[in-house]
Design a protein with these regions (language model features):
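Sec-dependent N-terminal signal peptides of Gram-negative exported proteins
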Residues: 1-12
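N-proximal helix/coil linker or "cap" segments that precede and/or mark the start of modular domains
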Residues: 10-28
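A short beta-strand-turn-helix
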Residues: 26-46
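Thiol-based oxidoreductase modules, predominantly thioredoxin-like and allied folds used
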Residues: 28, 68-93
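Short active-site neighborhood of thiol/selenol oxidoreductases, capturing the structured segment around
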Residues: 44-55
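Conserved redox-active cysteine motifs that mediate thiol-disulfide chemistry
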Residues: 54-68
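Structural alpha/beta surface segment adjacent to cysteine/selenocysteine redox centers
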Residues: 92-105
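Non-catalytic, surface beta->alpha helical segment in thiol-disulfide oxidoreductase systems
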Residues: 105-150
Length: 150
């Protein structure tokens, strides 16, 4: 029964568009997710954020919590970016995909891409922290700095 439920969840997760997924999933094809996100970004005049991390990562969960508890920041992010969660964990380090980007020193790590795939920014999220979480003002400033001009 447990395996049947896990299989159903995996199928459901595989079909969800990249920006609608809320968790890091080692079974995802990150390369396909990024390509889909680039197409969405191109069609909608947005940029792409690659959010690299894993479910094991407390700071990844804290960053997710910031977006969940600050709807104005989440709305701004969704209006200007297509966000793709790229899993990094023992089950799937996504080495092939991540080899195209600068080395990641810690998690979560954010890459901002233009809709054509050009890397614009490699962001260590430690710089966005304050105390035991991420600073809403710093995160919003980061998003505003890298949002496309409309």
């Amino acid at each position: 029964m447990l395996f049947a439920c896990a299989g159903a969840l995996a199928q459901q997760s595989q079909g969800a568009p990249p920006e609608q997924r809320e968790s890091f999933d080692p079974s995802r094809d990150a390369a396909k997710d990024i390509q889909a996100a680039l197409r969405q970004a191109e069609a909608s005049g947005r940029r792409v954020i690659l959010d690299v991390g894993g479910e094991w990562c407390i700071w990844c969960r804290r960053l997710d919590s910031l977006f969940a508890s600050h709807p104005e920041i989440e709305e701004y992010r969704r209006a200007h970016f297509v966000t793709v969660k790229v899993n990094w964990s023992p089950e799937n380090k996504n080495e092939q995909v991540l080899s195209h980007y600068p080395k990641v020193a810690g998690y979560p790590h954010l890459f901002v891409l233009e809709s054509d795939g050009t890397l614009l920014k490699s962001q260590d999220t430690g710089e966005l922290e304050k105390g035991k979480g991420h600073d809403p003002e710093k995160v919003m400033a980061f998003l505003k700095k890298w949002a496309p001009s409309k």
